[in-house]
A protein has these predicted regions:
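Donor nucleotide-sugar binding loop of glycosyltransferases
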Residues: 11-14, 40, 62
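Catalytic metal- and UDP-sugar-binding loop of GT-A-like glycosyltransferases, i.e.
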Residues: 58, 81-83
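A conserved acidic beta->alpha catalytic loop
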Residues: 21, 37-45, 85
Length: 98
């Protein structure tokens, strides 16, 4: 399984497109999605609530957020994405195969 870790802060405008795209893999149980919020003041977490497996809240800092997400990840492959990074299903599955 792939664990996709997405550190965010105030990404309400970007997050839904990315998360909606990842739902096919999530439905196949090929990935888990971990959103790590670094203090958003917009509705980022509300938008993501039903589209991710975990929402964690922590202090701001990409490295801190990534490490917190990695600490609960269940996958044997970790993929770190930005909220506005779009990766195809084929690309993700090729990472899993390597």
């Amino acid at each position: 399984m792939i664990s996709i870790i997405i550190p965010v802060r105030n990404e309400a405008q970007n997050i839904s497109k990315n998360l909606n795209h990842l739902q096919e893999l999530r439905r196949r149980n090929s990935c888990e999605i971990i959103l790590v919020d670094g203090g958003s003041t917009d509705n980022t977490t509300e938008i993501a609530n039903n589209l991710v497996d975990h929402i964690l809240k922590t202090k701001l800092g990409r490295a801190v957020q990534q490490n917190i997400g990695a600490s609960i990840a269940k996958g044997n492959t970790l993929v770190f994405l930005h909220a506005d990074t779009y990766i195809t299903t084929k690309q993700l599955l090729s990472i899993k195969e390597d």
